[in-house]
């Protein structure tokens, strides 16, 4: 069985990016001495599944930051060739979250990092998320792209842990209840 796991930062008012996708408010708080648990989180993940918006944002970084395979779920990118530098690292697919996980299960994948606001919402709506690590950044944006959208029903969570960092960020780890 493939399990999916979320690791994401949000503003105090619940946004993951400005309306135009800008994450300057997050990047300016980047402290290379604090990894906020990311290394431990990603260590046991076999694959990363992200949405188009996250993929396009990561393409603007100086270097490709991932050392494991990435599946980009997007109807718009399905027929787009993978950039030469990312061949063997990235695949595009228009499959649904459930179908994508079934495909990965056939490849003997066990644990997957889910990244990207809309994609996280899709996985949540389908009941496919095992746990969420949310790092809250002490800034109010007032508007932007929310982490959570409309859900068909309440999703109960159990707090597994919570900690704060010297930079003022607060991280909470939740397990989703069945």
Provide a role label for each language-model segment.
Residues 1-178:
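Enzymes that bind and transform nitrogen-containing heteroaromatic metabolites
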